Curated annotation (Swiss-Prot):
Composition skew (Low complexity), residue ranges: 128-139, 219-239
Source species taxonomy: Eukaryota, Metazoa, Chordata, Craniata, Vertebrata
Residue ranges with Acidic residues bias: 203-218
Record-given protein name: Homeobox protein GBX-1
Gene Ontology molecular function: DNA-binding transcription factor activity, RNA polymerase II-specific; RNA polymerase II transcription regulatory region sequence-specific DNA binding
SUPFAM superfamilies found in the cross-reference section: Homeodomain-like (SSF46689)
SMART domains named among the record's database cross-references: HOX
Length: 363
């Protein structure tokens, strides 16, 4: 027999291997009856790259290799010729060999497209699947084991219909790369979303940390020099807290817990700062009840009020010790007190409030 002959074995060889002696069995006997069903069930009977070998047992395939001088188009011509003259003589006797053939089919491992063209492959597979479904229930029952699902086989049919590249590399190039491209796109999308969402968070973090360091350096140089960091702990807190007092508001409404090395700043509003300054003019140290009253009135936590007063006292001591230009030894009533003003607040209105407060505070 010739394996290149396209889906047929000579009658004695193939039939003797599969069914009874003298049974002629070929693809033609399968194609003869009613036209094959097309549609989604085209390849359901067989595995992906195994379905279109000559339908005989592997023992019958062994003796005859491909003839050396045969051009590659000869199998197509012979197979097309064999498709035209169909005969149905040995169909009933060939059914037992059909069972053996469907069991033997998955053992073929070579891709079929070296032998047959895509249209012949599709026609042969359709005929074999339709005939096996009609005439023999056992191959139909065995079909899900050796075959792939219709959803997996439909892409294979589309890919087989593209002649230039052989299916196995082409299949592995296109279809596995489709989910990979989807993943790449989704990860890029996630990266874009993260980069679109991160600037807010990263800016806040950078603003929080960088703003602390910048404010600290600025305040230390402006109020007492870098020696303020070398002093005891209250002065360190004072340098940090005056950053919240003088610097730009970093994060609004975040409680600044005490005792943390790097904590979030509390951005006080100008009204809160004015009230705190008033209280500090009256009293440098607060009792617990006063602190709770002030915190409740200003809608702050007691910890925020306590830390603000600690920082304000440290700043006041720094100014008292280092600022020689303070008038009459009372730096508290100095009109050069710096109060942080948010950007959205009118600075002139706040300055006029400051002047009114200063005038009202003086006797």
């Amino acid at each position: 027999m010739q394996r290149a002959g396209g889906g047929s074995a000579p009658g004695g060889n193939g039939g003797g291997g599969g069914g009874g002696p003298g049974t002629a069995f070929s693809i033609d006997s399968l194609i003869g009856p009613p036209p094959p069903r097309s549609g989604h069930l085209l390849y359901t009977g067989y595995p992906m790259f195994m379905p279109y070998r000559p339908l005989v047992l592997p023992q019958a395939l062994a003796p005859a290799p491909l003839p050396a001088g045969l051009p590659p188009l000869a199998p197509l011509a012979s197979f097309a010729g064999r498709l035209t003259n169909t005969f149905c003589a040995g169909l009933g006797q060939a059914v037992p060999s059909m069972v053996a053939l469907t069991t033997a089919l998955p053992s073929f491992a070579e891709p079929p497209d070296a032998f047959y063209g895509p249209q012949e492959l599709a026609a042969a597979a359709a005929a074999a699947a339709a005939t096996a479904a009609r005439n023999n229930p056992e191959p139909g029952g065995r079909r899900p084991e050796g075959g792939l699902e219709a959803d997996e086989l439909l892409p294979a049919r589309e890919k087989v219909a593209e002649p230039p590249p052989p299916p196995p590399p082409h299949f592995s190039e296109t279809f596995p790369s489709l989910p990979a491209e989807g993943k790449v796109y989704s990860s890029d999308e996630e990266k874009l979303e993260a980069s679109a969402g991160d600037p807010a968070g990263s800016e806040q973090e950078e603003e929080g940390s960088g703003g602390d360091s910048e404010d600290d350096g600025f305040l230390d140089s402006s109020a007492g020099g870098p020696g303020a960091l070398l002093g005891p702990k209250p002065k360190l807190k004072g340098s940090l807290g005056t950053g919240a007092e003088e610097g730009a508001p970093v994060t609004a409404g975040v409680t600044a817990p005490g005792g943390k090395s790097r904590r979030r700043r509390t951005a006080f509003t100008s009204e809160q700062l004015l009230e705190l300054e008033k209280e500090f003019h009256c009293k440098k140290y607060l009792s617990l009840t006063e602190r709770s009253q002030i915190a409740h009135a200003l809608k702050l936590s007691e910890v925020q009020v306590k830390i603000w007063f600690q920082n304000r006292r440290a700043k006041w001591k720094r100014i008292k010790a280092g600022n020689v230009s303070s008038r009459s030894g009372e730096p508290v009533r100095n009109p050069k007190i710096v109060v942080p003003i948010p950007v959205h607040v009118n600075r002139f209105a706040v300055r006029s409030q400051h002047q009114q407060m200063e005038q009202g505070a003086r006797p």
